[in-house]
Amino acid sequence: MRLDSITLEGMLPRVFVSESIPDSEIWHSTATFRRGESYLVEASSGGGKSSMCAYIYGARTDFEGKLLFNGVSATNFDMARWQKLRRGNIAYLPQDLMLFPELTALENIRLKNGLTGYASDSKIEGWLERLGIASRKDYPAGRMSVGQQQRVALIRSLCQPFDFILLDEPVSHLDEQNNRIAAEIIEEEAKALGAGIISTSVGNHLLLHYDKTTHL
């Protein structure tokens, strides 16, 4: 199944239900993300951008409203349905990165790629070189800087087919040069797949030419 659209309909984190929240183009509204388009979701700290990404990925369900994939509610999706979406339709780079600190950078990447068989060794090596961390590929992830870890996690997120890629503050610890390189790589992969990009930011955003900027 190809995933052409993701819609958040009347969605609101339950923790916000009893609170007065600022005007939002997503919370308590209807927002649709379409395959092939790129979106920047800007938010203030604590505005719920990480929650939004986790809801779309099915990692959390503590929200009011509806999450729709191709117009179909995800409310009753079982684990098998979610696993299928995560393996073939939605790639995800979480803000907390979720790397195994005792494994090397390359081992973290290969752990995922071993499950998908998606990216060739040469492609992975090319990404490592372009992002300036090839010389650190055999270092334990826990000994790398946060910016280096962010680049490792980005490469790992690309080791699968996808219709959408969710990027939660993907360049918060990168300088402008590495930000641009990361953006180029993401754009190349998304374009090759005809995929959509949903990137969040509280300030330092991924340097893409976005089709739409939305305020959370």
What is each stretch, according to the model?
Residues 57-58:
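Helix-to-loop junction immediately C-terminal to a conserved catalytic motif
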Residues 74-91:
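ABC ATPase NBD coupling module
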Residues 165-169:
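Catalytic Walker B motif of ABC-type/P-loop ATPase nucleotide-binding domains
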Residues 140-148:
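Conserved ABC ATPase signature
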Residues 65-75:
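Conserved ABC transporter NBD signature motif
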